[in-house]
Curated annotation (Swiss-Prot):
Subcellular location: Cytoplasm
Organism ancestry: Bacteria, Pseudomonadati, Spirochaetota, Spirochaetia, Spirochaetales
Role description: Together with the chaperonin GroEL, plays an essential role in assisting protein folding. The GroEL-GroES system forms a nano-cage that allows encapsulation of the non-native substrate proteins and provides a physical environment optimized to promote and accelerate protein folding. GroES binds to the apical surface of the GroEL ring, thereby capping the opening of the GroEL channel.
GO annotation, cellular component aspect: cytosol; membrane
Gene expressing this chain: groES
Name of the protein in question: Co-chaperonin GroES
Keywords: Chaperone, Cytoplasm
MF annotations from Gene Ontology: ATP binding; metal ion binding; protein folding chaperone; protein-folding chaperone binding; unfolded protein binding
Oligomer status and interactors: Heptamer of 7 subunits arranged in a ring. Interacts with the chaperonin GroEL.
Any one biological process term the GO annotation gives: chaperone cofactor-dependent protein refolding
Predominant location category: cytoplasm
Family, as annotated: Belongs to the GroES chaperonin family.
CDD domains referenced in this protein's UniProt entry, alphabetically: cpn10
Any one Pfam family match given in the protein's UniProt record, by short name: Cpn10
Length: 90
């Protein structure tokens, strides 16, 4: 695995995969899936004063936030902490 450590006020997020079927059971083709803006925090930068999330948090982030990066064929984002709009509690 690549070891990516975000710098300063940045956060590395693993993007939650879009659902592959609807509530009624219909399968959604790959090209028709909506891109989600929910993910799990994988790593945080060193500027702890500006970062209010921690590793393992599920977060909602701005739709066009961050820079996309693939790690082990999974979609991730590196974005600024201020682009995270909410923590999702389950």
């Amino acid at each position: 695995m690549k070891n990516i450590k975000p710098l300063a006020d940045r956060v590395l997020i693993k993007i939650k995969e879009a659902e592959s079927k609807t509530i009624s059971g219909l399968y959604i083709p790959e090209n028709a899936k909506e891109k989600t803006n929910i993910g799990t925090v994988i790593a945080v930068g060193s500027n702890k004063e500006e970062i209010t999330v921690k590793v393992g948090d599920t977060v909602l982030y701005e739709k066009y936030a961050g820079a996309a990066v693939k790690i082990e064929n999974k979609e991730h984002l590196i974005l600024k902490a201020k682009e995270i709009v909410a923590i999702i509690e389950e």
